[in-house]
């Protein structure tokens, strides 16, 4: 059914137990899966089905190319040649195939299944005589097809059960976290935030800075970073976030003996909801499965600013924030750790 190819890719990437894989019709550098069952927030940021499939190497990985989004898989730079190179590098070039079946539309018809039968027969040592030819068979009745019957009655379902299950999951996870030693618990939370934000703090990141623009040379992210004053050998470095130039909080800072900077991060001050992928079905995974959220990108910018100021001044930083930027500042400071001495944040709508 729909999503089977994608789920085969993900299973092969995560679970060491499968010994052979054939994610037909979904290994592509183009469309990555149109169903909600094939997508999840954070799943493919900076990656895609080709790279996820390659995580199965060097175990046997088969697929086909059809007249759909997989049609370019055989083109250098588009997927399969790169997978083949990886397998060759691991000494198992023969363990991956992608026959050209581009004279057929998206399908799992007999020509595709015949490739799959042979692939599984060989690598699972099934011993069937080849070619494996399909034969007619009698369809099961509706009663025989049924999953639930008198011996196996259908369990409860619906929104009420969903609430019970999510409550149970929350209680289970809270109990697990609370059972951890403090340092281990701290590491779990840090890794969770690094995953959600999609970035670690890099104290040795490289930057260029010119005309009040800070550029992260690795990511090419560009941030407005403007010195408010030019204090010589300041005792502390203060970073102001979320404030517009001319704000009353900035008045008089030009004469301060401490160092003060004003930063503006990604889409700061933009009103309205963040842009989403055009799709009639509202589903976060369609947008955030491939793109960082606005919140995450703002934290990325803050991490860059913190790293840069820490490098050039070698002093702890004091962060001043509006209510709108409070959460982003707290997360960035948490991930950065030592460079941040103090946060002075105005109240937000949530605090």
Question: What does each model-identified segment do?
Answer:
Residues 57, 64-238, 245-261, 268-316, ...:
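Alpha/beta-hydrolase-fold serine-hydrolase catalytic core, especially in secreted/extracellular enzymes
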Residues 8-19, 23-26, 30-38, 42, ...:
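Catalytic-domain carbohydrate-binding cleft regions of carbohydrate-active enzymes
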Residues 38-43, 241-244, 295:
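Short, flexible loop segments at the rims of nucleotide/cofactor-binding pockets, characterized by
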């Amino acid at each position: 059914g729909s999503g089977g190819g994608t789920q085969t890719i993900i299973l092969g990437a995560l679970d060491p137990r499968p010994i052979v894989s054939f994610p037909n019709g979904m290994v592509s550098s183009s469309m990555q899966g149109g169903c909600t069952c094939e997508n999840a927030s954070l799943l493919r940021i900076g990656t895609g089905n080709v790279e996820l499939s390659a995580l199965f190497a060097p175990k046997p990985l088969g697929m086909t190319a059809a007249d759909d989004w997989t049609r370019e898989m055989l083109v250098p730079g588009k997927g399969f040649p790169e997978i083949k190179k990886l397998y060759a590098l691991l000494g198992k070039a023969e363990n991956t195939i992608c026959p050209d079946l581009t004279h057929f539309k998206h399908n799992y018809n007999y020509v595709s299944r015949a490739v799959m039968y042979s692939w599984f027969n060989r690598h699972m040592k099934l011993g069937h005589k080849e070619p494996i030819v399909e034969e007619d068979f009698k369809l099961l009745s509706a009663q025989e097809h049924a999953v639930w019957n008198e011996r196996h009655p259908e369990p409860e379902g619906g929104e009420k059960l969903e609430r019970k299950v999510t409550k149970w999951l929350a209680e289970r996870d809270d109990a697990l976290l609370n059972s951890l030693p403090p340092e281990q618990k701290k590491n779990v939370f840090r890794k969770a935030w690094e995953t959600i934000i999609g970035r670690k703090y890099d104290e040795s990141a490289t930057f260029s800075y010119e005309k009040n623009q800070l550029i992260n040379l690795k990511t090419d992210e560009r941030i407005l970073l403007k010195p408010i004053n030019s204090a010589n050998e300041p005792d502390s470095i203060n970073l102001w976030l979320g404030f517009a130039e001319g704000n009353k909080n900035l008045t008089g800072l030009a004469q301060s003996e401490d160092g003060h900077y004003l930063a503006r991060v990604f889409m700061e001050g933009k009103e309205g909801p963040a842009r989403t992928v055009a799709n009639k079905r509202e589903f976060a995974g369609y947008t955030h499965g491939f793109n960082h959220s606005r919140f995450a990108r703002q934290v990325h910018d803050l991490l860059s600013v913190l790293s840069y100021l820490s490098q050039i001044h070698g002093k702890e930083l004091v962060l001043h924030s509006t209510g709108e930027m409070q959460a982003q500042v707290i997360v960035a400071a948490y991930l950065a750790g030592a460079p941040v001495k103090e946060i002075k944040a105005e109240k937000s709508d949530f605090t």
